[in-house]
UniProtKB/Swiss-Prot annotation:
It is a multi-pass membrane protein. Translocates 4-amino-4-deoxy-L-arabinose-phosphoundecaprenol (alpha-L-Ara4N-phosphoundecaprenol) from the cytoplasmic to the periplasmic side of the inner membrane. GO terms for cellular component: plasma membrane. Pathway: Bacterial outer membrane biogenesis; lipopolysaccharide biosynthesis. It is found in: Cell inner membrane. The lineage of its organism: Bacteria, Pseudomonadati, Pseudomonadota, Gammaproteobacteria, Enterobacterales. This is Probable 4-amino-4-deoxy-L-arabinose-phosphoundecaprenol flippase subunit ArnE. Heterodimer of ArnE and ArnF. The gene is arnE.
Length: 111
């Protein structure tokens, strides 16, 4: 169960980061303020919820196990940047993502 909470905390944290990125997207001057406030508001909600879930994780898992699992954020952000904004991700970056996932599996199996 705590693993699900950890993944959800990670996804909400990344969601907050992605909302911040979306807030910076260029728009016409007329809708800019509303666009900015909407995405920044969503970012705050996501990050606030992530913080609450993170506190639940820290009550259960040792910080030495829990904190490295937040490396999932790098994986989620890379996938989102690639799929949502069609950013180029070089092979070396994908290798890094694979190594991060491997590290998470190794650390997770030790818990």
């Amino acid at each position: 169960m705590i693993g699900v909470v950890l993944v959800l905390a990670s996804l909400l944290s990344v969601g907050g980061q992605l909302c911040q990125k979306q807030a910076t997207r260029p728009l016409t001057a007329g809708g800019r303020r509303r666009h900015l406030m909407l995405w920044l508001g969503l970012a705050l909600i996501c990050m606030g919820a992530a913080m609450v879930l993170w506190l639940l994780v820290l009550q259960t898992l040792p910080v030495g196990i829990a904190y490295p699992m937040l490396s999932l954020n790098f994986v989620w952000v890379t996938l989102a940047a690639w799929k949502i904004w069609h950013e180029q991700v070089p092979p070396r970056h994908w290798l890094g993502v694979a190594l991060i996932i491997s590290g998470i599996i190794i650390l997770g199996s030790a818990a």
